[in-house]
Amino acid sequence: MTNISLKKINKSKVYQYIYRKKTTSKLQIVQELQMGLSTVSQNLNLLEQEGLIEKNGFFESTGGRKANALQIVSDFKISIGIGILKGMFHITAVDLYGNAFYTDTIPLPYSNTPDYYKQVTDAVKEFISSRQYDNDKVLGISIATQGITSPDHTTVLYGDIMNNAGMKLDDFSRYLPYPCYLEHDSKSAAFLELWNHPELDSAVVFLLNRNLGGAIITNHQIHQGCSMHSGTIEHICVNPDGPLCYCGNRGCLETYCSANSLEQASGMTIKEFFPLLREKKSPQLIQIWEDYLKHLAFAMKNLNLVIDAPVSYTHLRAHETLSDL
């Protein structure tokens, strides 16, 4: 191993240690990594000069000089997420810890036209320029949409909710000078679960948005299936004679356990539904909610028997949907 390689390894070890600890001191690094004080000091100076770390206050004194509190610069690099929905899109920017530090929702009905994709990507570029970020600061952009993608994540193959079959990654990436990735919104939610819970080996993920969605995690990976349909729990049939689903079948879990199903059954919006439900004055609303919970629990129990893994529920910017859960 060359001296240059060793220096790079030591520098990386120091940075990764600070990243994991979130806040630490020079002495803690020396002790934990068993490096010499001069080696640690040299690497801290390099990392600070490169803008990768910063001093942020002091630790309490134990009798001598107060030690600097060292942290990474969490937005040294950022990633951006775009959530495409039927009547709007969301933009979220996250730092190196995955913390969202910027979110915005922009009303814009989806249409498979160049003008639509230009408006979405212009909003992303406007955010980046407003923060005066250089292009190399952006690690990449992930686009989540309601639709099953091709195995290479370049095209939406099935998208009845938004009528977006044929949407292509290139529709966005041609306007954006960053690496881009296209994914089903439910599987994007599962990626978030893996990020927040790296110890998670397997799980069934329920995405409680306006439409129900789901994903399967096995062996720390999102299970895609042979035709990318794995995890589409919203189309499990719970009643062959039940309500008609947008997929053309009857009695799908979607028709019982989505915000849309609650609105259709109650004849009111979600914003109206939950406050009235909490008043406990309407037997009809209580029954609708109990039916929702009963079908959701039924699906969770059966999927747990198949996968034998924890069941998780989440939502992605679920405005006016089930964030009240």
Question: Language-model segments: which ranges?
Answer:
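Proline-aspartate-enriched helix->loop->beta-strand connector
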Residues: 303-313
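Gly/Thr-rich phosphate-binding beta-strand-loop-beta motif of the actin/hexokinase/Hsp70
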Residues: 66-101, 213-217
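Glycine/GP-enriched mid-protein hinge/lid loop-to-helix segment characteristic of carbohydrate kinases
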Residues: 103, 177-283
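Glycine-rich phosphate-binding loop and adjoining helix at the ATP-binding site
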Residues: 104-202, 323
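Short, cationic-aromatic polyanion-contact patches
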Residues: 2-9, 25, 58-76
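N-terminal helix-turn-helix
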Residues: 23-55
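Extreme N-terminal segment that seeds HTH/winged-HTH DNA-binding domains in transcriptional regulators
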Residues: 1-31
